[in-house]
């Protein structure tokens, strides 16, 4: 009771005058107002910073990353294959710079690629031909760079502009960085090689697809073989140094790999698959092998034993004339016909059926030696046709 009476007396004596209470009330309201304004400013600043980060304009701090310049339908496939290739790396990164919204790129990769495992995918919005935008993605620290050909008219001109900005700008790309550029027209290969100064590997997409299309249509099951070799699931091609094979012939080196298959050599920047068996290997040569992983490429100099009497010699069988039906038409039709002409026997025929205008003008100028070409306009989805 004593403490209750004492505290009530103290509280009643501290009430103060009405003026004092008014000042305290105004101070409290002012404090609440200032704190509210401060919270609003902090919230607005954080939201602005997050909004700026969503725009994809911040600098990329990754090192040793794979840099993709441009956006095309092939991006999802490229990222998927790189994710598989980087499974043995702890901190792998893929950086994409394209004139697309960052959120849209992130959503597209998440939808089509899914789990990227140990690989981090970073998207940035910008033009690959703009030096300021290129600086954002740290090209000097990249392990490899892929320049994609965009959709639309004259895509090769855009690729050349990107290479000029990349190699002739203020960025110093190290020689160890492997640069791959996608080109569609064979006439533009020489300008790209001139700009690349020996540092750019040109992939002639249209010609490559045409070759694979012709070869797979002529041999059943070959598409499965190409799929096995060209993706990172299973076995694929690898280049490796093997100085211990110096002085051996290619035929002798075939038996020096236990868990991979030797298929060619790389000398002075040129790759030759299936060289002569008596070709002598040099210490600075690189071997081209088919292996499950680069860690399985190991040389074993112990000579294997086998019965040479069981080896069979094949005889060449003459190829008869063929008839090929091509349904549809696109910009690769002429390339496919030329590639087909190089494989078939004399007297072979090819019929192109497509529902396009001026088909005779489009195909009339294709120069063929062994193949007799004819065309017909019609709806390829019609059963009556």
Predicted region positions:
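Single conserved hydrophobic/aromatic residue that forms the stacking wall/gate
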Residues: 2-6, 10
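Cytosolic regulatory regions of ion transport systems
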Residues: 9-385
């Amino acid at each position: 009771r004593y403490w209750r009476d004492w505290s009530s007396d103290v509280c009643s004596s501290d009430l103060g005058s009405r003026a004092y209470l008014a000042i305290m009330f105004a101070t409290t309201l002012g404090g609440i107002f200032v704190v509210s304004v401060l919270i609003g400013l902090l919230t607005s600043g954080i939201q602005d910073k997050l909004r700026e980060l969503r725009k994809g304009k911040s600098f990329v701090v990754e090192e040793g990353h794979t840099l993709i310049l441009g956006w095309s339908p092939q991006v999802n496939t490229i990222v998927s294959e790189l994710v598989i290739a980087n499974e043995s790396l702890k901190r792998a990164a893929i950086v994409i710079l394209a004139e697309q919204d960052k959120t849209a790129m992130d959503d597209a990769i998440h939808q089509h690629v899914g789990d990227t495992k140990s690989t981090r995918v970073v998207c940035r919005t910008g033009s690959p031909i703009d030096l300021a935008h290129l600086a954002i993605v740290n090209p000097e620290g990249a392990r490899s760079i892929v320049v994609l050909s965009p959709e639309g008219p004259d895509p090769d001109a855009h690729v050349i502009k990107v290479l000029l900005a990349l190699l002739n700008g203020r960025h110093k790309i190290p020689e160890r960085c492997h640069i791959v550029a996608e080109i569609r027209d064979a006439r533009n290969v020489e300008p790209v090689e001139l700009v690349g100064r020996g540092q750019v590997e040109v992939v002639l997409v249209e010609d490559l697809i045409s070759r694979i299309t012709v070869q797979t249509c002529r041999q059943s099951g070959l598409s499965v073989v190409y799929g096995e070799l060209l993706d990172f699931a299973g076995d694929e091609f690898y280049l490796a140094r093997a100085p211990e094979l110096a002085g051996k012939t290619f035929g002798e080196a075939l038996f020096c790999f236990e868990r991979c298959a030797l298929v060619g050599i790389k000398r002075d920047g040129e790759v030759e698959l299936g060289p002569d068996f008596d070709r002598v290997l040099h210490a600075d040569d690189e071997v081209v092998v088919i292996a499950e992983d680069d860690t399985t490429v190991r040389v074993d100099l112990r000579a294997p034993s086998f019965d040479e009497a069981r080896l069979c010699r094949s005889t060449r069988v003459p190829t008869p004339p063929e008839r090929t039906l091509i349904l549809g038409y696109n910009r690769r039709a002429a390339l496919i016909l030329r590639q087909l002409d190089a494989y078939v026997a004399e007297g072979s025929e090819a019929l192109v059926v497509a529902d396009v205008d001026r088909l005779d003008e489009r195909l009339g100028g294709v120069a063929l030696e062994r193949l007799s070409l004819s065309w017909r306009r019609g709806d390829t989805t019609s059963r009556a046709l």
